[in-house]
Amino acid sequence: MDNNRIGEVQRKTSETEVLLQVELDGTGNHQIDTEIPFLNHMLTLFSFHSLCNLRVTARGDVEVDDHHSVEDIAICLGQALKMALGDKRGITRYGEATVPMDESLARVVLDLSGRSYLVYNVPMEREMIGNFATENVREFFQAVAANAGINIHIDLLRGSNTHHIIEAVFKAFARALKDAIEIEPRMEGIWSSKRVL
């Protein structure tokens, strides 16, 4: 097992500047500052429930819109996860979690296959939470999937409170990822009949 499963990405555009580091074999330690309080909250939950250590510093044109910052942070998270996973030797590969948050229940199933695909079935009524546009939840996971090479299925099984719905989704993603990145000691190589992911 690689004892240094860490990915770090810096991204600078005319719209945003992001520095992100993720450590897969962590304890859920986090330092997060994105200028978007609700996204800070969700990334904190992701770190805590995945047990991945996460450091994020992001500055962007949030006075215009939060979309650029949300998407670029997700791009960096996806790239950092891909870097940290390396050749994926010994990983469990698949993860699934169903997580409640009061009246809401979300399910996330994922495969660290190297093939990016997002299925997203999460209807929400509220358009904004603070300065965070809820439509960007989909954009966030689309960017993570595309840049990490993950197949992610996200389904809202029930729910009415938008904050609770998004929180359940992020927690379920974190728990599913936690399982998928675990090392299976009996698997000496890559857990694929093709021997590559």
UniProtKB/Swiss-Prot annotation:
Native source species = Syntrophomonas wolfei subsp. wolfei (strain DSM 2245B / Goettingen)
Q: Main EC class of this protein?
A: lyase
User: Where does the protein principally reside?
Assistant: cytoplasm
Which CDD domains does the record cross-reference, listed alphabetically? IGPD (cd07914)
Record-level GO BP terms = L-histidine biosynthetic process
Q: What is this protein called?
A: Imidazoleglycerol-phosphate dehydratase
Q: Which Pfam families match?
A: IGPD
Cellular component terms (Gene Ontology): cytoplasm
